[in-house]
Amino acid sequence: LTLLAAILFSGSFRGNPALPDPDGDGIRTLAAKVATGVFRVTRHPMMWGFALWGLSHMLVAPRMDSFLFNGSLVFLALAGSYGQDRKKEATMGDAWAKWERQTSFWPRLSQLGKIEPRTLLIGAVFWFAATWAHNLAGSYEAGIFRWL
């Protein structure tokens, strides 16, 4: 789950019409394009990355503090995505409606194979670095480092 979260998160920085845009023109241009990469999986890859990260941490550390912190993160990511859709509908109108028609709120796992190799590599490197850094942060080893 955390590898998928890292891939979705990493891919969300390029060509994302949900990011803030003061003048609005660049975002409308992005929303008019055909969805590619992680946006074929979900229109909120960054937020789903946060949600999957939180869910995975609740699964590996089923304690009350983990449920409270990570459960809040999951809730904020998904509720925030829903709220962002409503805000973009109001501010972008038809451009966002077109984007919504070609993307999905819920991840479409069948589209994972459409993610560019570059994004997969960046996500894997990010995941590797984040799992390696657990020990440096004073936590226990995570991911593959638990077994090395």
Which ranges hold each PLM region?
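Membrane-interface loop-to-helix entry segments
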Residues: 1-4, 40-48
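Portal/gating segments that form or line small-molecule/metal binding sites
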Residues: 1-34
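Short membrane-interface loop/juxtamembrane segments of multi-pass integral membrane proteins
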Residues: 25-38, 99-109
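Hydrophobic transmembrane alpha-helices
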Residues: 43-148
